[in-house]
UniProtKB/Swiss-Prot annotation:
Primary location class: other
MF (Gene Ontology): cell-cell adhesion mediator activity
Official protein name in the record: Endothelial cell-selective adhesion molecule
Residues exposed to the Cytoplasmic side: 273-394
Induction entry: Up-regulated on the surface of platelets upon activation.
Biological source species: Mus musculus
The organism's taxonomic lineage, starting at the top: Eukaryota, Metazoa, Chordata, Craniata, Vertebrata
Annotated glycan sites: N111, N172, N216, N239
């Protein structure tokens, strides 16, 4: 909301502003907080300690000869993007402080300097000191605030050195060096140790990235190379050994690498093959097997029947149709009828019965193999209708 000039609200705000300005001027006149010139911006090294100097004075010393001066002190840290963080306080004679922080002197000396120990990078920021002095009646007679900016520096952490490329004669390689932590950012320098000492500069050296490029390698360039990461507060080193090889050595190394890779692949393949085979055997062992149904044994023909050469009864003719039956010799005084065409269709007269031993039926194939042997060999019997003596199918 914008207030126009001459309104009652504007007059009230003006009165309040003038009153606060007068009170602040009176407070500054009663006491003043001091920070040494040139020490409002400090730098310190991580792990060490630092003192933030500050003290206050009263304007009218003669009116404060009695010991009832009650200061209220607060130190707090302000960092970008964070809420103010209280570091130390002294209120009503009780001091509260975080670990590693303390007052350098007794507060009765009016010296409110703050000591910070075991510094970390996270301790960087703006420290504000607020002092409010009261009398024995609890009335404020002076108040002041001062700021000191602190920057914690970090020496380079031990860097890591590496070699990029295959170092054999005539090729190019790059030596890399990198520190994981440094404030401010580290600068890098490469050198080769004795007996062939050498310090490298640009353009082969990149002091910001920490890389050193070596071109057209030779045997004489072999040796120990040292990288030094350095900033304003410290340094750290690492080294790498360069062994330049001839073509034969390079071929041996390449062959060893390839052979190792091929060997690993073969071992992996054998392991997979063994696992697959074991799994297959396990599955076969776990299968439920059913007994095969025995083949049906069909009756075979008599030994007088003929069988085809392929072992099946595809064409069987009755031996009775092929050969006439054996008749008994005629007795004297008996009549032997002669069969005719018409008598074959009618029932023939009963022939005289001759007592002879019945022929033994032996089922043999033309090759001399029995029916049981054919059944074991897997032959399949085929039923073929037989012919009667009259030539009709039975």
């Amino acid at each position: 909301m914008i207030l126009q000039a001459g309104t009652p609200e504007t007059s009230l705000l003006r009165v309040l502003f003038l009153g606060l300005s007068t009170l602040a001027a009176f407070s500054r006149a009663q006491m003043e907080l001091h920070v040494p010139p040139g020490l409002n911006k400090l730098e310190a090294v991580e792990g060490e300690e630092v003192v933030l100097p500050a003290w206050y004075t009263m304007a009218r010393e003669e009116s404060w000869s009695h010991p009832r001066e009650v200061p209220i002190l607060i130190w707090f840290l302000e960092q970008e993007g964070k809420e103010p963080n209280q570091v130390l306080s002294y209120i009503n004679g009780v001091m509260t402080n975080k670990p590693g922080t303390a007052l350098v002197h007794s507060i009765s000396s009016r010296n409110v300097s703050l000591r910070l120990g075991a510094l970390q990078e996270g301790d960087s920021g703006t420290y504000r000191c607020s002092v409010n002095v009261q009398n024995d009646e609890g009335k404020s007679i002076g108040h002041s605030i001062k700021s000191i900016e602190l920057k914690v520096l970090v020496p380079p952490a031990p860097p890591s050195c590496s070699l990029q490329g295959v170092p054999y004669v005539g090729t190019n390689v790059t030596l890399n060096c990198k520190s994981p932590r440094s404030k401010p950012t580290a600068q890098y320098q490469w050198e080769r140790l004795a007996p062939s000492s050498q310090v490298f500069f640009g353009p082969a050296l990149d002091a910001v990235r920490g890389s050193l490029k070596l071109t057209n390698l030779s045997i004489a360039m072999s040796g120990v190379y040292v990288c030094k990461a350095q900033n304003r507060v410290g340094f750290a080193k690492c080294n790498v050994t360069l062994d330049v090889m001839t073509g034969s050595k390079a071929a041996v190394v390449a062959g060893a690498v390839v052979g190792t890779f091929v060997g690993l692949v073969l071992i992996a393949g054998l392991v997979l093959l063994y696992q697959r085979r074991s799994k297959t055997l396990e599955e076969l062992a776990n299968d439920i097997k059913e007994d095969a149904i025995a083949p049906r044994t069909l009756p075979w023909t008599k030994g007088s029947d003929t069988i085809s050469k392929n072992g099946t009864l595809s064409s069987v003719t009755s031996a009775r149709a092929l050969r006439p039956p054996k008749a008994a010799p005629p007795r004297p005084g008996t009549f032997t009828p002669t069969p005719s065409v018409s008598s074959q269709a009618l029932s023939s007269p009963r022939l005289p019965r001759v007592d002879e031993p019945p022929p033994q039926a032996v089922s043999l194939t033309p090759g001399g193999v029995s029916s049981s042997a054919l059944s074991r060999m897997g032959a399949v019997p085929v039923m073929v209708p037989a012919q009667s003596q009259a030539g009709s199918l039975v």
